[in-house]
Regions:
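Non-catalytic, structured segments within soluble enzyme domains
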Residues: 1-37, 41, 73, 175, ...
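Short active-site loop at a secondary-structure junction
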Residues: 58-63, 84-104, 112, 116-122, ...
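Short coil/turn segments at secondary-structure boundaries
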Residues: 25-30, 56-62, 162-164, 172-176, ...
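Substrate-binding clefts and substrate-entry loops adjacent to catalytic sites
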Residues: 20-27, 129, 148-161, 182-184, ...
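A penicillin-recognizing enzyme superfamily signal
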Residues: 33-56, 65-67, 77, 82-93, ...
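Conserved catalytic neighborhood of penicillin-recognizing serine enzymes
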Residues: 2-11, 16, 114-170, 186, ...
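Mid-domain, small-residue-enriched loop/turn segments at the edges of structured enzyme/sensor domains
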Residues: 131-138, 166-205
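Proline/serine/threonine-rich low-complexity "mucin-like" segments in extracytoplasmic/periplasmic regions
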Residues: 333-369
Length: 369
């Protein structure tokens, strides 16, 4: 812990917390923060190095990175490439999470009694005029286990789950994990069409590492932990299996290091690309995009963000860049062999069947924001 630094994204984020903790006092007051200067320096350098190297080709002009311990202690926060040029904190600003929102969808499914091997159709679907599509419009055209759908980030599977559960159940899970931002009360939310901060999203993933929720991201050592609820052991084990499948068999292979659990995120027209995950008690979220919301050149969460995440995680953990032990070929999960899977979708069989019309999802009251 250090004195609260000035002129940084972390300082701007921490200052309101410090003022609230100190109260009405006069004179200089020193507060101990959770910031780790060494990890902060690594985060700044790695994020900037990647964007400086690849940004022009990929049309990436901005990025953010937040690292926290599984109890919510924020140890590094990079809200942009240059604080002097722009004080807007992109780690705390709201952007679309894309497929990384599927954490909440699959948690709701597991809490409802489904398991990682429960079948879900990976076929085209249409609900009340809404027709979601997998990446590049390719599908398995059959039932696949939940773990396969999650690893491959099947969009139609996520929408089918949200339809069967009802949007209210998914929203309830997100609220329980600390998401306060507005979430669309329709099936589009299954694909992360709402907006939330990278810090809030990362804290939700931290709850899986911690085994309890909610995890509140905080900047001060004096933070009083709120009452938490432990996950059901079966639900927790299932969610961890899903996250591991993404990093070791699926769209998150670029982030594959031993002990990694995470999920890619990609939004429509490549406006936002996050990757969020953890190793041990270190939970990290990365986002790349543009302030003007212009499209990047095909950047997906399993690409540049996953590479930045891996580079930072290896540096933070003091590991070499030795390749991780990737799981057995994907076809034992009903997925293509390694190397054939694409970003946030299933690049296998082209569309061969018409969309399956479904009735409207069950309606339930949604708690107000």
């Amino acid at each position: 812990p250090d004195k609260l630094p000035t002129g940084s994204y972390f300082a701007d984020w921490a200052l309101p917390q410090a003022r609230a903790a100190i109260g009405a006092r006069y004179g200089e007051t020193i507060v101990k923060t959770t910031l780790d200067p060494a990890l902060q320096a690594k985060a700044e350098k790695i994020l900037n190095d990647f964007i400086a190297r690849d940004g022009k080709v990929l049309n990436i002009t901005q990025g953010a990175l937040v690292a926290m311990r599984k109890d919510g202690r924020v140890v590094a926060m990079v809200g942009g490439r240059d604080y002097g040029a722009s004080q807007f904190n992109r780690a705390d600003g709201a952007r679309q999470p894309g497929s990384s929102f599927k954490l909440f969808v699959y948690l709701a499914a597991l809490q409802s009694g489904m398991t990682t091997t429960s079948p879900i159709l990976d076929t085209p679907v249409q609900v009340s005029g809404y027709t979601p599509k997998n990446h590049e419009g390719k599908y398995r055209d059959r039932e696949i286990p939940l773990i396969s759908a999650f690893a491959a980030s099947s969009n139609v599977a996520a929408v089918r789950l949200a339809h069967d559960l009802g949007p209210a159940k998914v929203i309830k899970v997100a609220r329980q994990l600390g998401v306060t931002e507005k979430i669309p009360d329709d099936l589009t939310m299954a694909l992360g069409t709402g907006s939330m901060s990278l810090t809030r999203l990362t804290a939700a993933y931290a709850s899986i590492a911690a085994g309890e929720y909610p995890i509140v991201p905080h900047a001060l050592d004096t933070f009083q932990k709120p009452k938490t609820t432990a996950y059901d052991p079966k639900v927790l084990a299932g969610m961890r299996d899903l996250l591991r499948s993404a990093t070791h068999r699926g769209t998150g292979l670029e982030a594959a290091i031993d002990g990694a659990y995470g999920k890619t995120g990609t939004t429509q027209d490549y406006h936002d690309a996050p990757f969020v995950g953890y190793v041990g008690d270190l939970v990290v979220g990365v986002w790349v995009g543009n302030d003007d919301n212009s499209s990047m050149n095909g950047v997906v969460g399993g690409g540049e963000p996953a590479k930045i995440w891996k580079a930072f995680m290896l540096s933070a953990l003091g590991r070499s860049a030795a390749p991780a032990v990737v799981e057995d070929p994907l076809d034992d999960l009903g997925l293509p062999l390694e190397g054939e899977i694409g970003p946030d979708g299933l690049p296998v069989t082209p569309l061969t069947v018409p969309a399956d019309p479904l009735p409207p999802p069950p309606v339930a009251p949604v708690a107000p924001i």
